């Protein structure tokens, strides 16, 4: 099993520290970098090609579609997990529709972040069960 490399992108030092403190204890997961902005995240992802990018939703500032596209172009194998405090579900659904592979709420980082990283790296999605029906509804509207 190879090491899962992770870059943490969060505008708050406390947010980056929370992710780092949980992940540094995990065998098989290595934090390769920390950044504070969307532009830094794109540059670091292009350079380091991490397997997982933890990306705080506030970094998008209304440009989530463009940033997700740019991230996929610069590092196509990097999988994005969004971090959010309290974000409207439609914004989360938009991000998932445009390439994010999951999301985790800040309050759940200490409990679920390592599992989310491992499962998304393995090709699965990480979303709370209550979002699954909404995702299916969104997919039904896209194909209708």
Give the ranges of each region predicted by the language model.
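Conserved phosphotransfer microenvironments
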Residues: 38, 54-68
